[in-house]
């Protein structure tokens, strides 16, 4: 392996900070964005012009947050800081100036991990990718097949301006998609004479037709043009010259209404080769004339004018947290402005102070709305460290000001050549969001204008210059350069060795000599995202399967004992570190104290730095967050060193699954259609056991009849059922609970109406007031069980904020260990997923020549058609590594070391393993990678040799325990009286339209009838059926389904005379209801009902 290959491997395994996108954007907001908004906002003058209120943005202050991050999570509070800004109120008449520091609202702060804590939940603001403001030139074909061109000027906020040509070579303009106006009318309205325009254009002869057309319409002066403009833009209103002037002014030349933004001004200057200063962000006459000139050049096909590709990343920009927040602050401040103006007018001028004028509510509401309900503010995916990291690097085209799923066509979703090294071509969801939600590539970063950049090494005369930092280029700059891929072979001095090098130039592929190359990519992994870069032998997988592999790694459940992959890519350490799930040393120093809850590092100056560890905390996805120290007392540590493993980490590396022994062979049909056959070892040795923590909550509320009480005294519950409750009636920590057990005892007062007749009788006789409360306790739901790990009690006395009407809130956290079982979903890293179909005893599994039983049997037919051969390479590499007792790191795209490199490497490792003493059977040159297995049940060898090896296999979050569900009796929908649907509502199985057809096709009339009546919504019938079953009598004939009655009533309510009649013409009264529920039957239900029917 040459030295350059080692350098490439190093570049591939060293990545920039992966959460920088979030952090740097929020920092920009605090340093610049917020001040910009406050400055743009002032001064505010009242309607008379007497008073002026100035906000001094540069002097804003943030107070220390009320709670720290952990405390905010515990109290369901928001981790936020109070914003104060200095305001100056100037009275123009008296010259009096009042200055005051005013509270303007709470600003949620970003945690070190790039997240926000809102109402106790961790949230992430997803980056949005939108069309960049600027000027765009497009061509369209009209219905006669003739090409017309148009130019759109798109601002950051304000009205769109669109110029277009038509078949008569006339130029038109549209404002915000309104009616067409002759372009020269706009020029005249802007105060430009014919000569002003003609002097600016390179081909004025084309434009003269538009001037003539304007003259023919009788619009020859500025005033007439303004009237015409007003008529077109405000039809139906009486036109006036002053109105037209004001309209034009506010639409395009008023900075409050029209803003190109820094980016828009930069893009327009670049496209039209103008030199307008950056701070002039409204439209200028020069902009409009240059746009017209460029459009005419396009039409005449001269002057090197080119069309724009709107899907090119040079024309799309990323809005990160800071900018999204800035836009929201602007909305809040605009609402505030109205309030301030009103208060200025209403109040006494002399006694007004800034504090009386400024009301923080509108700003607080705007910020709260953004973090609480914006489409881009998402509940963080915390299943494992990779899921968390990917969520922070996600880039979405949806959201306010972006696209919608329905409207987005194929072009937007497609992979574009400019994505190279910027957005990952692999990682995107399957389904309706495909291509709209992307992931940032590993080395990509977002520049100050919001364009995505990717790094390169400069090449001069065929030699790589690696001194200093790499050069970052945005998509439009890169188009002008010849860029070679990251895996070109170079010698010691960095000279490119090949005679011809493949390069990308202007979105095309060419082959050039090394001297013509401008840049070389930094690393082969810079093209793909973090999740995709964790897949070894990625280059051998079909893209669709690699996509599934990337997405499924994010769904891997953290296991009880994580294990690092035998075959990795070298990025595992950094993913674990940047995800924020592992504690990292902030200083160089020495570990002076370690236990399960904290690690103390003493720096060289002798100062102590304490790192607190998380113990069995619940994540957003109910998985378990837990830290295990990996340093010992007295160990020296350096800045950035991992001190403890988090969930799904081992030794500071990400460890999503387990390395298990896999054989690719069919076994009695148990791995048909992607099913997976596993050994009992995975269950017994807790290889795939995970801990899940469920949260149960109950409120004691104030009711009309008095307060609800949390207590141990629960009516009609035996003492043994209360064994685990403390004197308050709350479960003790450490208790083991099963479904139906009481977690928190609660009684609710009940009124007179709630009492059954026999209780009223007793009270009438004995005159004593029985305890009139009913049991409303929090119980463990069906199918759940586990151990109580935490109980939290919130009351107003302790200073907790409670929901309105609640006196006390109790939360109980129950942890359960889930072993792997039939029905759980498992997957490898190459998109090879399946459901466990059977768990076999160890002794029945096929076994190797040395007697080791395999752990998993996969179907070999899952490989060829899906073309994800990477799994086979991983399997054999893992087999070699396990026999050599080492771990292997393989950078994806390894062809730079030579052709067929993966194959050669794996073969070499297998041969090396076979040379070890007693291991000659590990590799058979006649059948490389295959072994002859024996059947565990009979001891007979199988017919054919089988591919066997170690692969990293994951258990996914789709667990059968959360999905399986059954119902015998349960709740019904109020209107239709049909059973509810879904596991959460204890619902039934829907017998839909197609199932009805199937039964009809077989003529199964009675089955069908009972399914549609007695088993569903015939209220009287189902009670009678229950009665008959209990008494052992035959089930009576079904009656009318309730949903039929609802339909009849709906038709009658439309005024249709519609009814149901018997054979002899008698109308059936649908309104006559048999009351199915007597409020509280005094005898057991079925007896009382039975008596009624017998009567």
Curated annotation (Swiss-Prot):
Example GO molecular function? DNA-directed RNA polymerase activity
| UniProt cross-references to CDD domains, sorted A to Z | RNA_pol_B_RPB2
Q: Which PROSITE patterns match?
A: RNA_POL_BETA (PS01166)
User: What is one Gene Ontology biological process annotated in the Swiss-Prot or TrEMBL record?
Assistant: DNA-templated transcription
> Might you give the EC number(s) for this enzyme?
2.7.7.6
Answer whether the UniProt record assigns the keyword Translocase to this protein. no
> Sorted alphabetically, which InterPro entries does this protein's record hold?
DNA-dir_RNA_pol_bsu_ext_1_sf, DNA-dir_RNA_pol_bsu_external_1, DNA-dir_RNA_pol_su2, DNA-dir_RNAP_su2_dom, DNA-dir_RNAP_su2_hyb_sf, RNA_pol_bsu_bac, RNA_pol_bsu_CS, RNA_pol_bsu_protrusion
Q: Which UniProt keywords apply?
A: DNA-directed RNA polymerase, Nucleotidyltransferase, Transcription, Transferase
Pfam families xrefs: RNA_pol_Rpb2_1, RNA_pol_Rpb2_2, RNA_pol_Rpb2_3, RNA_pol_Rpb2_45, RNA_pol_Rpb2_6, RNA_pol_Rpb2_7
Give me the reactions it catalyses: RNA(n) + a ribonucleoside 5'-triphosphate = RNA(n+1) + diphosphate
Could you name the Gene Ontology cellular component terms for this entry?
Answer: DNA-directed RNA polymerase complex
Annotated stretches, region: Disordered: 1069-1095
Q: Which family does it belong to?
A: Belongs to the RNA polymerase beta chain family.
Per UniProt, subunit arrangement is: In cyanobacteria the RNAP catalytic core is composed of 2 alpha, 1 beta, 1 beta', 1 gamma and 1 omega subunit. When a sigma factor is associated with the core the holoenzyme is formed, which can initiate transcription.
State the function annotated in the UniProt record. Answer: DNA-dependent RNA polymerase catalyzes the transcription of DNA into RNA using the four ribonucleoside triphosphates as substrates.
Q: What is this protein called?
A: DNA-directed RNA polymerase subunit beta
* Species classification: Bacteria, Bacillati, Cyanobacteriota, Cyanophyceae, Synechococcales
Gene that encodes it: rpoB
